[in-house]
């Protein structure tokens, strides 16, 4: 690569539905930057994650620098920048859940799934991610599987709970 060349981003094209939805969201805001989180969520909902090429495609639609979209994508832990499993498990590792014993939940998840935080099971079924807070502190330890919140967890309940998610 020459010193003035930018690295190549993989070929990526937004679907017509994604582009239309992003343009629709953009019109709700005076500053198109404000629509970047919604645009990222639109792509993630369709594809399961947000590839690098999508950052540039979203930026083009919004008419803003790709670095602005990248900044939003990396700031929000709910935006996935690499492929994830069919079900994403987010367990809370905040101070309150620490006091309430999240470590036992984490250990039970790691044992049952045979993965560490940040990894995806061999069959692509689950991705395990720690999250600083799920906003459910009075009911800890907590975790979310996809959009479902599970509270007052015990390590013993983990195997049965995971069986609900095929």
UniProtKB/Swiss-Prot annotation:
Gene3D superfamilies: Glutaredoxin, NADH-quinone oxidoreductase subunit E. [2Fe-2S] cluster binds at residues 92, 97, 133, 137. Its cofactor is [2Fe-2S] cluster. Pfam families: 2Fe-2S_thioredx. InterPro entries: NuoE-like, NuoE_dom, NuoE_N, Thioredoxin-like_sf. Belongs to the complex I 24 kDa subunit family. This is NADH-quinone oxidoreductase subunit E. It comes from Escherichia coli (strain K12). The gene is nuoE.
């Amino acid at each position: 690569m020459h010193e003035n060349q930018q690295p190549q981003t993989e070929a990526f094209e937004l679907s017509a539905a994604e582009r239309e939805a992003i343009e629709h969201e953009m019109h709700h805001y005076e500053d198109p930057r404000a629509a970047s989180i919604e645009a990222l969520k639109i792509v993630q909902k369709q594809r399961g994650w947000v590839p690098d090429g999508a950052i540039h495609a979203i930026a083009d639609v919004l008419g803003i620098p790709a670095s602005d979209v990248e900044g939003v994508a990396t700031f929000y832990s709910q935006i996935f920048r690499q492929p994830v499993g069919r079900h994403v498990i987010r367990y809370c590792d905040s101070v309150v859940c620490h006091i309430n014993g999240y470590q036992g939940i984490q250990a039970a998840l790691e044992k049952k799934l045979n993965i560490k935080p940040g990894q995806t099971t061999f069959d692509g079924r689950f991705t395990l991610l720690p999250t600083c807070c799920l906003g459910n502190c009075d009911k800890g330890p907590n975790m979310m599987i996809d959009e479902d919140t599970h509270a007052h967890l015990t390590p013993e309940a983990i195997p049965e709970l995971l069986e609900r998610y095929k």
